[in-house]
Regions:
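Beta-strand/loop substructures that line and gate deep hydrophobic ligand-binding cavities in soluble
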Residues: 13, 112-174
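Short Gly/Pro-enriched turn/cap motifs at secondary-structure boundaries
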Residues: 23-25, 84-87, 115-117
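Short beta-strand segments that buttress and anchor functional surface loops
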Residues: 81-84, 106-114
Length: 179
């Protein structure tokens, strides 16, 4: 799937990334990347402040932030997300699983209910300094253990996440390069 590897090099697609171990039996794995002309220390705060009702998701705001515009600046009070903290996702919550500023931010689907045990979703943001600035590599790993879970992953989760994350990466690039 083209959206599953959007912008990523073959080496990035095959590389092990932080967070892979949090969903080792994933059926959906997608690696997407973008080069940002800014140092990682200037990109990471945009990622750290993400969340519904916070900075937003920098994607299609009318879908994932109920029309509220994603932040256009760094918000200091949203820079304190640490491992174990909740990241509001709207109807669902994520949890910060790995935070290693300014290089790694990994979130996973949070919660302890029956549904959260049957749906596993991990999203990693890995920032690597390059001569051009920062290479931002993302990896989604997911598994839906529900009836028709494989079909849900293939037909809805994979394409939907691909469209949204591609837009997010482009917006992150624009924001980080502008500030």
């Amino acid at each position: 799937m083209a959206l599953g590897t959007w912008g990523a090099s073959p080496d990035e697609v095959s590389a092990s990334l932080p967070g892979d171990e949090l969903c080792p039996d994933a059926r959906l794995v997608a690696t997407r990347s973008i080069t940002i002309s800014a140092p990682a220390r200037d990109v990471f705060p945009w990622i750290r402040q993400m969340g519904f009702g916070r900075a937003g998701w920098y994607s299609y705001d009318w879908i994932d932030n109920l029309g509220r515009k994603s932040a256009r600046s760094i918000i200091p009070e949203w820079q304190n997300v640490e491992v174990g903290d909740a990241i509001p996702g709207g109807p669902i919550d994520f949890e910060a699983a790995i935070v290693d500023a300014p290089n790694v931010f990994v979130m996973r689907l949070g919660g302890t209910g029956r549904l959260s045990r049957r749906i596993r979703f991990v999203l990693a943001y890995v920032l690597r300094e390059t001569d051009e600035g920062t290479r931002l590599v993302t990896r989604v790993r997911a598994r839906v253990d529900l009836p028709l879970g494989g079909m849900i992953e293939r037909l809805f989760l994979g394409p939907g996440d691909g469209i949204m994350l591609r837009k997010q990466l482009i917006t992150l690039k624009t924001r980080a390069e502008r500030f």
